[in-house]
């Protein structure tokens, strides 16, 4: 496991730029590389606290766009075009409220979700797989045709199966690592593009998407 370095260069950059977390640079890098969102777009951010990704997304979509975040923890005020909803992603009513606040389908869904690790490999892998499945189910309900999903993933015994499931819903799926990820970290990101609207799901309860 990578040694935690609380004051690495990305920590310093985040503090200097007034960002809420160093994780903001991960999303910024991905958006610059893949061009997944445009001005005026609608975006949903899953697990949005403390708000680092919300700020990057707010800037990306501009004043005419809208960003909705969901998290159990409060995010506080980010920007006029950002709405943060408190709630559990497993609750279908929460996803429904997010769709209502968005005012229409989303061009992009983002997820930096990760479970609290127990050190028990099988349990941790199952918890991460559940979060990815929830993210995919919500995206399948909310994304517009051709939309995209960014989701954190760790290397595990479930890795290939998870990626294969994403490929059922998107024409283009790849896995990338960001420079802002800590050295030695197992953290990767799934970049899923060109959503098949015919695969739209009504299931946001964490059950397997089909």
Regions found by a protein language model. Give the residues of each.
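Conserved class I S-adenosyl-L-methionine
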Residues: 39-49
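Conserved SAM-binding motif I beta-strand of class I
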Residues: 66-71
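S-adenosyl-L-methionine
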Residues: 72-118
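Short glycine-dipeptide loop
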Residues: 63-64, 143-148
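Class I SAM-dependent methyltransferase Rossmann-like catalytic core
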Residues: 1-39
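Conserved SAM-binding loop of SAM-dependent methyltransferases across substrates and taxa
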Residues: 50-62
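Class I S-adenosyl-L-methionine
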Residues: 156-210
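A short glycine-rich, Lys/Arg-flanked "PGG" loop and its adjoining helix->strand segment in the class I
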Residues: 129-145
């Amino acid at each position: 496991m990578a040694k935690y370095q609380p004051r690495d260069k990305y920590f310093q950059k985040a503090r200097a730029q007034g960002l809420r977390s160093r994780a903001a640079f991960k999303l910024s890098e991905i958006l610059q590389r893949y061009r997944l969102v445009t001005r005026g777009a609608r975006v949903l951010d899953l697990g949005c606290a403390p708000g680092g990704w919300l700020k990057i997304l707010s800037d990306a979509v501009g004043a005419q766009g809208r960003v909705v975040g969901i998290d159990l923890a409060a995010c506080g005020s980010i920007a006029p075009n950002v709405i943060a909803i408190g709630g559990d992603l497993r609750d279908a009513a929460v996803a429904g409220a997010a769709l209502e606040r968005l005012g229409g389908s989303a061009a992009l869904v983002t997820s930096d979700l990760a479970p609290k690790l127990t050190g028990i490999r099988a349990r941790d892998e199952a918890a991460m797989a559940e979060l990815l499945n929830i993210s995919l189910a919500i995206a399948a309900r909310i994304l517009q045709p051709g939309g995209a999903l960014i989701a954190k993933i760790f290397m595990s015994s479930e890795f290939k199966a998870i990626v294969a499931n994403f490929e059922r819903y998107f024409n283009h799926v790849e896995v990338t690592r960001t420079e802002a990820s800590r050295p030695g970290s197992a953290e990767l990101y799934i970049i899923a593009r060109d959503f098949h609207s015919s695969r739209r799901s009504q299931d946001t309860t964490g059950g397997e998407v089909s």
